[in-house]
Amino acid sequence: MAITIKKVSSKKELKTFIRFNYELYKENPYSVPDLYDDMLNTFSPKKNAAFEFCEAEYFLAYKDNKVVGRIAGIINKRANETWNKKEVRFGWIDFLDDIEISRALLDAVAQWGKSKGMDTIQGPLGFTDFDAEGMLVEGFDQLSTMATIYNYPYYPQHMEKLGFEKDADWVEYKIYIPDAIPDKHKRISDLIQRKFNLKVKKYTSGKKIAAEYGQAIFELMNEAYAPLYGFSALSQGQINQYIKMYLPIVDLRMVTLVTDAEDKLVAVGISMPSLSEALQKAKGRLLPMGWYHLLKVLFLHKYPPMLDLLLVAVKPEYQNKGVNALLFSDLIPVYQQLGFKYAESNPELELNGKVQAQWEYFKTCLLYTSPSPRDRSVSR
């Protein structure tokens, strides 16, 4: 029976769009489900500040009157202007192992993009870099994280059969926490601190760090990440949203700021305990008992052995000068004290040599691109 594609046009259909991922991966031990309410907010123009410069459509695939796939089409106007491109993004793509389903989903986004004047389709990408991006091509037997996409091995096989080509590589790393700060690391840290007159700042109040450095943290991100592939600067609306969303829930012991002699922010490192197992137990829902599993980690500090390195950003003029050593000289003793055994990085561009040497190779994600949003049945 033919595949039918339907544009999501009601709240009921949007709920179906979100829940399809839960159903597809409910028996998979490595997938980490997003929180349902977070997804509703992400897809809502009223709740997601990225809609200031993005537009989106969501599509469901049906076969025999059953949902068999989903995909989001996104146009990030700011990214297109920054990189002088006309790209439509596809994201939140899931499908059964049937090439006609994946073809129909990607065709739907391609044709929508073409109707908006776009000439290239690319993904998986979200609205911005704060959304998960890339398609897993290795490490299918590793537990995912809340910041990454998990997919079945047949996904990248479909992409290649449909004529898509790799456009970028991301890699993730597992970093084992040392028993003691390496002597060389400590010497570099001390030297850099004296040479540039830098200071390590710590906070115990979420309100205080938000008031004094919340804006500066995300402005530093915009500055540090500007040259990276496909990055689009956070708007003021997004910055306000993320300050309210993230700073109240992080354990400030795992947040380290580095400032110069004038207290201007030079670098920031933000970590948090892995929520992967808690999110799996919650199964995407805070109710009836999902809140308890997250509460144990976030507020009762019942930490698993793994932590996530959410954010490391260094001001461009201080990059490649050892400032990262200063961050981790402060953070490593905290990790030891809290009982963490290893950390997992967020996906990092494989060509980002400024950070690659620090980590052990762990697993790889890919970004795919196709040169023009035309009929996906045409081989290229």
Identify the role of each PLM range.
Residues 81-163, 282-361, 365:
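Acyl-donor binding region in acyl/amide transferases
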